[in-house]
Amino acid sequence: MNDIEISQNAEMLPIQTIAKQAGFDEKVVEPYGHYKAKIDIFSEKPNTQLGKLVLVTSINPTPAGEGKSTVTVGLGDALNDLTGSAMIALREPSQGPVMGMKGGATGGGYSQVIPMDDINLHFTGDMHALTAANNTLAALIDNHLQQGNELNIDPRTIVWRRCLDINDRALRNIVIGLGGRFSGVPREDKFDITVASELMAILCLAQDLKDLKERINRILIANNYDGQPIFVKDLHVGGAIATLLKDAIKPNLVQTLGHTPAIIHGGPFANIAHGCNSVLATKTALRHAKYTVTEAGFGADLGAEKFLDIKTPVLGKQPDAIVIVATVRALKYNGGAKLADLKIEDVEALQKGYINLQRHIKNMQRYNIPVTVSINHFISDTDQEVNTLVKLIEAEGISAIVTDAWAKGGAGSKDLANEVIALADTNQGPMTKLYDNNGRIEDKIKTIVQKIYGGSDVEYSPQALKKIKECVANGWDHLPICMAKSQYSFSDDPKQLGAPSDFVMHVNDINIRLGAGFLVVQTGKVLTMPGLPKHPAALDIDIDSKGEITGLF
């Protein structure tokens, strides 16, 4: 059976049963049907004691797929089986990848969160609420221009964009306000995909409703004609925007195929945002379980770095262990093997491609957190390839655990779970910080480029230098850095596989995200509104007369 067939044939427990198992009072459980619920954490008396936190990351993604979410879910099931108290905290899927190329984000095989089709399609409406809130703010800005422009906003400086939760390249560059003086002030604008909206980052970093509203009010929307910054608070609409997110801020509860409680909430991409699920979701799981397994988007150079340098300080809890997911076939691809040949034994390509995993291992060890590698097993992997990879990893002084979560779920992940339990009990002391937030913007960027990516230097466009000067002048240079970079390579060139070194990173622009609390550094050709591929996944999705969905993955 494929993923959706496995999901549809699963025996799900009522969500109230899952909530009780997780220790939630029935009064805070707000069901969305039989198998989904919102958790009203603001009505819950919080447990101040936090469990162990396990961060799952991976090597750079390849067309072959790494199975990071699959390993995350399988590990969560195995930990729950072994300890009786584990939860999973994941991001919500975006409709863009579901209908585009990447597919959903619920794991695979017998290591899935369910109901898979509901989660991948609309879920509890969080993405729509974020889209509505984002576009309401955009409409209010343009209405302010139309109604006399009391704040003297320079339309050419407006940085707040409209958004849509679908890949639509035709909306990357648009002109609005056409049709005469009753149709608004004409100006150029752009659409982003919803998960790239600053509101998504804010939702995922907010500690509560008060913090949410304060962060929204801090959003920089434009400059006035005197060059002074204009914020949402100047429009007096922060409360209205926060109101539209009053339900979206509540974490969502579902279950795995193994009936492990899973909280799915928030979904920023790691290549254009910080790539982590919400602080509220992670903290809720930590308060209710001995072990919380969470993941960060794309490879460790993006998602894990941002988890550790952006999310962890807000969360107030560092990971107790890090799992790096790798596959034999993805490393062979990094070693020069062709996509069509990845099922053929090629130890030489594996050894060449290992440098990609090796750099990720060294990067994670830099933070002084225990690390292990999960070798996500595929049927095409040969014994010689697996044994070779295990020896290479163990030469780094860490463990390598072969995992078969797709085919066996939690049962195929118990060795990994036992290793994680042992690592999480190791007292390593405080996490080592990568950089000092109070350092110069250029120094922080260069530190990431040199220490994490393996580059040698950074080149800035005139626009990027202008933004740095603006940040310094306004006292915004103390914010952490959120790199927007290709997920396929350590460099800003997606074709440079393996572990490129001594390259120059090209910074095109810097987006100032005061509400989220970081600076987005735009590199290479990263797009905040993706396009659909020649054969989008939507072509294979269908529904029959009984409401059964096919083609989701």
Swiss-Prot record:
<dbReference type="InterPro" id="IPR020628">
    <property type="entry name" value="Formate_THF_ligase_CS"/>
</dbReference>
<comment type="pathway">
    <text>One-carbon metabolism; tetrahydrofolate interconversion.</text>
</comment>
<dbReference type="InterPro" id="IPR000559">
    <property type="entry name" value="Formate_THF_ligase"/>
</dbReference>
<dbReference type="GO" id="GO:0004329">
    <property type="term" value="F:formate-tetrahydrofolate ligase activity"/>
</dbReference>
<keyword id="KW-0554">One-carbon metabolism</keyword>
<dbReference type="GO" id="GO:0035999">
    <property type="term" value="P:tetrahydrofolate interconversion"/>
</dbReference>
<dbReference type="GO" id="GO:0005524">
    <property type="term" value="F:ATP binding"/>
</dbReference>
<dbReference type="InterPro" id="IPR027417">
    <property type="entry name" value="P-loop_NTPase"/>
</dbReference>
<comment type="similarity">
    <text>Belongs to the formate--tetrahydrofolate ligase family.</text>
</comment>
<dbReference type="Pfam" id="PF01268">
    <property type="entry name" value="FTHFS"/>
</dbReference>
<protein>
    <recommendedName>
        <fullName>Formate--tetrahydrofolate ligase</fullName>
        <ecNumber>6.3.4.3</ecNumber>
    </recommendedName>
</protein>
<keyword id="KW-0067">ATP-binding</keyword>
<keyword id="KW-0547">Nucleotide-binding</keyword>
<keyword id="KW-0436">Ligase</keyword>
<feature type="binding site">
    <location>
        <begin position="62"/>
        <end position="69"/>
    </location>
    <ligand>
        <name>ATP</name>
    </ligand>
</feature>
